[in-house]
A protein has these predicted regions:
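A cross-family structural signal marking well-folded subdomains
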Residues: 140, 146-294, 304-305, 482
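Short coil/turn segments at secondary-structure boundaries
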Residues: 11-15, 52-58, 76-80, 94-100, ...
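Extended acidic/polar, glycine-enriched regions
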Residues: 1-25
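Short, basic, low-complexity termini and linkers enriched in Ser/Thr/Gly/Pro
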Residues: 471-480
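A conserved hydrophobic secondary-structure block that centers on an alpha-helix together
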Residues: 21-82, 90
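Extended, well-ordered alpha-helical scaffold/bundle regions in very large, multi-domain proteins
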Residues: 55, 72-76, 95, 105-119, ...
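Sequence context surrounding c-type heme c attachment/ligation sites in exported
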Residues: 67, 243, 258-402, 415, ...
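Short alpha-helical scaffolding segments that buttress acidic/His motifs in well-ordered protein cores
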Residues: 39-47, 60-64, 79-87, 119-123, ...
């Protein structure tokens, strides 16, 4: 049943004017048909993210006309049927990309994507949604590519740019997993010597953990700070609940805010964030292996290979003739003694063990199973450290280029919606060099990605020219767009 039953008293929905510029459709057939072209042309152009071609528009108008010309049917009912067809079209569901005309059709080349495709790439990268009217107007005039810097600045100032922070950071640093991660709070606290602090790992605390990491990245992006502050900095973001979790006093209220950290604080930088410490742990204890692998993979871009299938779990190596519960460091030493394990674990373990003062909930602790924690170690590259403070300093000072390369590869992958291959190596090198010249500023990374050949050009080489009617005769690249 669909009401109201009496069409004379049909009430327009609140968003009626967004689709129909007139209060009532024209009564004459020719004028109604032209009005249908106007309504559907505007909607299809927006949905397809480029001008709709005449052939497609005629089909949509005919589809609508077949409904609203029937007795007892309203004009809006016919338009609604055509709108459904637009939303079911591959041109809406997928990103359809055309190329700019090729200067020498006989020579294989990687042509630039046209300006409409560039507008979509830019918008989905920064906003995770379709281009707005300004981007579309610039693309229509062929002026977007030469105004990229100003448009990126405008888009970064828009509230929709928060999507880049949440989606990219959520995937890159795995903080999207925080709210669903399972952990046995009692068991974790018991390993720390029976902490009397009551911990309620509820949705509010988990959300604060995630927001701490997002807000650090967001501040670096907004104020064009150095990306190295992700590794170590003298501030963080907390509310009362997260501050209490960290043992930080003097913070009240539910709102997250920036606070300065003491000089000797182990906090500061993503390696001390509860969000990351939580998702790189096991449900009942810390995991130096997961934490070390996280640093190698996500921060340094040098992941260790997966372990052989026949290697036993760490818990199976437990046992002590004195009845004492071994520490995680001792268990790791036993595990590392196996020839098949030593090569990879010698890379991962020192970094992971440097974070052992943080339990599986991201809380600071001095002891594990009644024994003082030893967080010292030596990296495979030769640098020695005493604790997590030293490790963060070493990563920031000695491995900045590795970090620049890693974050460049991650962001370029996010921007393109695909994995990188050998064709992209030169572009990554150029962005890393730019970051080095500009002291790791966020703008160097963002503009470097947007101005890079992989972002600006088609992946497949072609010798074909592109028709002026891109949706009818062009050679098209249809790419499934999944929000990053």
């Amino acid at each position: 049943m669909q009401g109201p039953l009496d069409a004379k008293h049909w009430t327009r929905p609140a968003n009626y004017s967004r689709f129909f510029p007139r209060d009532e459709p024209p009564q004459k057939d020719a004028e109604r048909r032209q009005y249908a072209r106007e309504v559907l042309g505007k909607f299809a152009t927006k949905a397809f993210r480029r001008p709709v071609d005449d052939r497609t528009l005629e089909k949509l108008v005919a589809m609508a006309e077949a409904i609203f010309t029937q007795p007892g049917h309203r004009f809006e009912q016919g338009i609604a049927r055509a709108l459904v067809a637009v939303l079911a079209s591959p041109r809406f569901v997928f990103r359809v990309e055309a190329s700019e005309p090729v200067a020498k059709p006989s020579v294989a080349t990687h042509p630039f994507v046209d300006e409409y495709a560039l507008a979509s790439r830019l918008s989905y990268f920064l906003w995770s949604t379709m281009p707005d009217d300004e981007l579309t107007r610039l693309a229509e005039r062929g002026e977007l590519r030469k105004n990229l810097a100003s448009q990126v600045k405008r888009m970064r100032a828009d509230a929709r740019s928060e999507a880049l922070t949440q989606n990219f950071v959520g995937q890159w640093l795995q903080v999207l997993d925080v709210e669903g991660f399972t952990v046995d709070v009692r068991t974790v606290l018991r390993q720390d010597g029976g902490s009397r602090q009551r911990v309620i790992l509820d949705t509010e605390l988990r959300r604060a953990m995630r927001r701490e990491t997002e807000m650090l990245f967001g501040l670096i992006a907004q104020e064009n700070r150095s990306l190295l502050e992700l590794l170590d900095c003298d501030y963080t973001f907390v509310n009362a609940k997260l501050a209490a979790h960290y043992g930080i006093k003097g913070v009240s209220g539910k709102e997250m805010r920036k606070i300065s950290l003491p000089k000797d604080s182990p906090r500061g930088g993503v390696l001390s964030h509860a969000s990351i410490l939580l998702v790189t742990s096991n449900p009942t204890r810390t995991s130096p292996v997961k934490r070390g692998q996280f640093i190698l993979d996500n921060l340094l871009g040098t992941p260790a290979p997966p372990p052989p299938a026949d290697i036993p779990a760490l818990e199976e190596a437990k046992g002590d003739s004195k009845g004492r519960t071994p520490t995680v460091r001792e268990l790791m030493a036993l595990h590392r003694a196996k020839p098949l394990c030593s090569s990879c674990h010698s890379r991962m373990d020192p970094m992971g063990l440097a974070l052992e003062n943080f339990n599986a909930l991201g809380m600071w602790r001095e002891k594990e199973s009644g024994q003082s924690i030893d967080a010292s170690g030596t990296l495979l590259t030769g640098e020695s450290f005493h604790d997590v403070r030293d490790l963060k300093r070493i990563l920031k000072e000695k491995h900045a280029l590795d970090f620049y390369r890693s974050v460049t590869e991650k962001l370029l992958t996010y921007a393109l919606g695909r994995g990188l291959d050998y064709h992209d190596v030169d572009a990554v090198d150029q962005i890393v060099q730019r970051l080095e010249r500009e002291e790791g500023r966020f703008s160097a990374l963002l503009l470097g990605v947007i101005e890079s050949a992989p972002f600006q050009k088609r992946r497949e080489a072609t010798t074909a020219t592109v028709s002026a009617e891109p949706l009818r005769n062009s050679k098209l690249n249809v790419e499934n767009r999944v929000n990053p």
